[in-house]
Amino acid sequence: MLIVQNLQTNILKSISFSIEKSECLSVVGESGSGKTTLLNAIAGYIDYSGSILWNNQVLENNPPWKRNFRYLNQRLYLFPHKTVRGNLILANPSASDAEQQILLSELKIDHLINRYPHQLSGGEQQRVALARALIYRPDLLLLDEPFSSLDWSSRKDIWKVLKNLIQTNEITTILVTHEPKEAEYFSGKQIQLYQGQLI
C-alpha cells in the first residue's frame, strides 16, 4: 500500500492520498499542474516535505535504487547498441531466457528479441520499454504519459496488453495522463491536480 501524506514541493501543496496493493490510480490535470513532480517525488528523484510510505515503511529512508519501482515516460531510454534481449538483460541480469520470452510474448514482440531499437516502429519500441520496466517485476509502476506520442490505434493495442499484465501480476500502478479515456480504461480511481493542489 502506498500512502502519501501532506506532500509538498516547490509545485505541490499538501497532497494526500493512498493506493491499495495492485490498484491502479490515474492522475489527471493540465500541463504544469504537478503530475510529473508527484511521480518524481514518489520515485525519490526530488526533495520534498511530508511523508510517503510504502508498505508502512517511510520511503525517505530508502534511496531510489533500493526501491523496486519502475518509471516509464515518453523518453524510452533504450540502449541503441543493444538488442531487445540486451536491453532486458541490462534491466534484470538474473532474468532467464524463458522469462524474457514469456514477457515479450505477452507483449506480442517475442519475434523482435534480436533486433535493435532503430529497427523497430514507435509502437514496438514502446512495448520493449514496457518489457524492460516489467522484467524486474516491480512493486510499483509509475507511468508518465508513455503512450502520448502514439496514434490511437497503437495506443489502444498497448492499453489492452498493459492492463492485462498489471492485473495478472498485481502491480500497483500510478498513471499520469491528459486523456480521460485512458484514465477511465486503466482505473476506476482518479485524482486531479490543479496548480499543485488536489481538487
Curated annotation (Swiss-Prot):
Domain of life: Bacteria
Binding site for ATP: 29-36
Gene3D superfamilies membership: P-loop containing nucleotide triphosphate hydrolases
One Pfam family, short name: ABC_tran
Coiled-coil features, chain-numbered ranges: none
MF terms (GO), sorted A to Z: ATP binding; ATP hydrolysis activity
InterPro entries found in the cross-reference section: AAA+_ATPase, ABC_SmlMolc_Importer, ABC_transporter-like_ATP-bd, ABC_transporter-like_CS, P-loop_NTPase
Biological processes per GO annotation: sulfate transmembrane transport
Assigned keywords, A-Z: ATP-binding, Nucleotide-binding, Transport
Domain ABC transporter residue range list: 2-199
PANTHER family: SPERMIDINE/PUTRESCINE IMPORT ATP-BINDING PROTEIN POTA (PTHR42781), SPERMIDINE_PUTRESCINE IMPORT ATP-BINDING PROTEIN POTA (PTHR42781:SF4)
Family: Belongs to the ABC transporter superfamily.
Entry protein name: Uncharacterized ABC transporter ATP-binding protein HI_1474
Annotated source species: Haemophilus influenzae (strain ATCC 51907 / DSM 11121 / KW20 / Rd)
